[in-house]
Amino acid sequence: MESEKKNYCFKYLKIVMAVLLAAALFYSGMKDYVKVGKTDIAVVELYGDYPAVNLAKQIWENYQCSDEITDFCFVWNGGVQVVTNPENFRQTNARVTGVVGMAALYDRQAALLEENDETGCVIDKDTALELFGSENCAGSQLTVGEQIYEVRGVVSWNQHTMLIRPSQKNQVCTQVLIRGKKGQNLEGAASDFLVGNGLSGILAVSYTHLRAHETLANL
């Protein structure tokens, strides 16, 4: 009888320990998840031989095939351009920005733009309202010069902005965003990336990636 009681207590103790271990692992995982959103990112201003879009894409593809995990995003600054709704010819001015690599480093909401989507775009709410009269315009088309884009999503940015995946291979990237690895300072992360890819640049600023597009717009 006493032996059965001991076995029961032992089994109960094992269950309790398993539950506590699972809870501890869950809590640890949640802490790591939360930290991802607060990770500092280096904004590097490139100079010298600016990498063209095709080179930026090649660098990104090379990293995807390697064992080294590095999160980065090249940025092409298209400046303020006229954006048009081809159906009713409504127009507005918007800052056009192209990204190559992990778009979410530019802004979390930029993840709406898939990696190889060269015909899609993400725009801010004000641009959507001025062009389409509504924020619910996903799937609608707009033009910039002779280029036609389809709206993939509308996001909350504080200025007229249009985000794309640049398709013209000769366009050059003037910035790169780099997320430092755990325990690595941003200067080291920027230096390693630049040297490893034969690029020249200077660390301009670092920021918490929740406000990425605002920081870049003010540079």
Which residues fall in each region the model found?
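Hydrophobic secretory-pathway targeting helix
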Residues: 2-36
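Membrane-proximal extracellular/periplasmic loop immediately following the first transmembrane helix
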Residues: 28-82
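Extracytoplasmic/periplasmic regions of membrane proteins
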Residues: 40-45, 50-53, 98, 108-111, ...
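The feature marks short, hydrophobic/small-residue-biased sequence motifs that occur predominantly
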Residues: 73-115
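Mid-to-C-terminal secondary-structure elements
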Residues: 100-109, 125-182, 187-190, 194-199
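A residue-level structural signature of the nucleotidyltransferase/glycosyltransferase Rossmann-like core
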Residues: 119-120, 141
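Conserved small/polar residues in nucleotide/adenosyl-binding loops
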Residues: 208-215
